[in-house]
Amino acid sequence: HYGLEDCREITLEANPDDLSKEYLQMLSALPFNRISMGIQTFDDATLKLLKRRHNARTATEAVRRCREAGYQNISIDLIYGLPGETKERWEKDLRQAISLNVEHISAYHLIYEEDTPIYNMLKQHQICEVDEDSSLEFFTLLIEYLQKAGYEHYEISNFCRPGYYSRHNTSYWKGIPYLGCGPSAHSFNGTTREWNISSIDRYIKGIEEGQRVFETEYLGPTTRYNEFRSEEHTSELQSHHDLV
């Protein structure tokens, strides 16, 4: 068993369409003090292409409901480099994200993972990958828009209002232990990394039957050092961009 009394950050990961008024009322009895939701984009056509269940209006209303439920630390995820992305569309996404006035914004470039529907669409030439010049332009716009809006660029993909950096993100790169609960969640105890199975049904059944519901990876000194150096390099690149 784990005591949660001293946890300064307990984050719930959710999809916008999950955050109904009733669901948030149920959460009020639990010790979550931060909500992170995967909005990805405010372009409804692209959300449909990505097979997301929510639309732009659902995402905006989810943030509003979280505020009404009393949450003062909200994070949203965005993705850029999406199929058909243009400078104008990305700027519109950034303006809408800023208008929500959330405490934290993470933005990641789209990665085409093998054996996913969108990867298959790319290989079948149904969609096109954005070029490197456009990707760089989108990243530059991301930094310019969010810093101008008062967000601190504290990690390569993460921006926050002053005092609202993600403790999990910074702990991850510093090698500090963390606990992840639920399907697909990751944990680290200082020497091993664990990740729970992704199937909700198998996860629940495994817990009920006392079965192992996670995989384990031992991180030797070399692996931990390489990850530390990777983060140092990322920080150097970020500092260089800020200077430029």
Question: Which sequence ranges carry the predicted segments?
Answer:
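C-terminal scaffold of the Radical SAM
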Residues: 1-235, 239
